Every structure is written in C-alpha cells, then in structure tokens.
Amino acid sequence: MQLVLAGKYIGAGLASIGLVGAGIGIAIVFAALINGVSRNPALKGQLFTYSILGFALSEATGLFALMIAFLLLYAV
C-alpha cells in the first residue's frame, strides 16, 4: 500500500513539471509582446490580441498538466 501511495506522489510530482514549461512559455509570449510594441507602437492592439491568444494556449498546456497531476493523486 505504501508503494502505491509513493508512486502516486512521484507521478503527480513529475506531471506537475509541465507547469514549468507553461510558465516559461508565458514569459516568452509577453517578452515578445514588449519587444514588438517597442519596435512598432502602432501595432499595439493587434500584438496584444495575439499575445493573449498565445498566453491562453500556453496556460492551457499548464492546466492540462495540473489536471493530470490531480487525477493521479485523487482518481487513481
């Protein structure tokens, strides 16, 4: 029983590593937004729209990793 519980915790910890990738992806998206607006301030609205879309896609991958971690902890 203890081995199964340890496996759950290790698996959930490894699954939550995907959150690091989501954080890095979000940082890259907003760094590109700042870079793009500083180069061409006239495109601020369009670049902001694209960056929100990129943020949502990056955050979705992180939420999927979090969902898998919770499933490993509580559903299995």
UniProtKB/Swiss-Prot annotation:
Which keywords does this chain's UniProt record carry? ATP synthesis, CF(0), Formylation, Hydrogen ion transport, Ion transport, Lipid-binding, Membrane, Mitochondrion, Mitochondrion inner membrane, Transmembrane, Transmembrane helix, Transport
The chain residues annotated with the modification N-formylmethionine are 1
Q: Which InterPro entries match?
A: ATP_synth_F0_csu, ATP_synth_F0_csu_DDCD_BS, ATP_synth_F0_csu_sf, ATPase_proteolipid_c-like_dom, F/V-ATP_Csub_sf
Gene Ontology molecular-function annotations: lipid binding; proton transmembrane transporter activity
Q: Where in the cell is it found?
A: Mitochondrion inner membrane
Give the GO biological process terms: proton motive force-driven ATP synthesis
Give the residue spans that cross the bilayer.
14-34, 52-72
UniProt cross-references to Pfam families, sorted A to Z: ATP-synt_C
Topology term for the membrane: Multi-pass membrane protein
Q: What role is this protein assigned? A: Mitochondrial membrane ATP synthase (F(1)F(0) ATP synthase or Complex V) produces ATP from ADP in the presence of a proton gradient across the membrane which is generated by electron transport complexes of the respiratory chain. F-type ATP synthases consist of two structural domains, F(1) - containing the extramembraneous catalytic core, and F(0) - containing the membrane proton channel, linked together by a central stalk and a peripheral stalk.
The record's PANTHER family line, in alphabetical order, gives:
ATP SYNTHASE LIPID-BINDING PROTEIN, MITOCHONDRIAL, ATPASE PROTEIN 9
Q: How does it assemble?
A: F-type ATP synthases have 2 components, the catalytic core F(1) and the membrane-embedded component F(0), linked together by a central stalk and a peripheral stalk. The central stalk, also called rotor shaft, is often seen as part of F(1). The peripheral stalk is seen as part of F(0). F(0) contains the membrane channel next to the rotor. F-type ATP synthases form dimers but each monomer functions independently in ATP generation.
Q: Which HAMAP family does the entry link to?
A: ATP_synth_c_bact
UniProt name for this protein: ATP synthase subunit 9, mitochondrial
State the organism named in the record: Yarrowia lipolytica (strain CLIB 122 / E 150) (Yeast)
The major lineage groups are: Eukaryota, Fungi, Dikarya, Ascomycota, Saccharomycotina
